[in-house]
Amino acid sequence: MNYTAKRYLFEQSTVREFFSGAYYDLFLVMRGSGVFRCSEVVLPAQQQNLIILKPGQGGRLEYAGAYGPLEIIRVQLSPQMLAQLSDEDTDFEKSFNVVPFRQVAVRPDSQIYMLLKNLARKLLVLPQESSQFGAAAFEHGILQMFVVLALRACIHAEFHTASVSRHHLMLDEVFLFIQAHLTEELTLDRLEKEFFVSREH
């Protein structure tokens, strides 16, 4: 199989091991809350989160059983499937590997999350619709859209993290500059010229 889609519903306290094997593993949290303990990081398995494991990665899902059930849809995609879904402008596997993580939890914005949720639910029932008109093309389109949205969620999260990091770095640089020039008169004009920012910032 080049891809699988499976729903997990946990209603009692649970600890379960997952391993991606040769697949790109995407876990979309539909409701509830738990944690994913991986070798390098603890990831929040909370509603609206998308957890991604690259091939060869594992994690232990821990659900305490409180505050309602935990529902997750797991979509596994092989490199071959990503190649089939790619086009001349977009290499999906390469795009996944540009993002600097082996295990990550991202929080898509509400619009992307709602689309991912609907697509994930559709992936669960596609095997029962294989006799319908255009089933193969429809399946290809659903999978392609799911992967694009998952990657967009990663890119948005990475951009936000980079922006926040850059903002903190800029503030650190400003404070260090002020500290080094405490005995001098520092005007906003001078700070503007030193750091190429507007005084409004």
Regions found by a protein language model. Name each.
Residues 19-36, 52:
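Short, conserved beta-strand element in jelly-roll/cupin
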Residues 40-55:
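Short acidic-glycine-tyrosine-enriched beta hairpin
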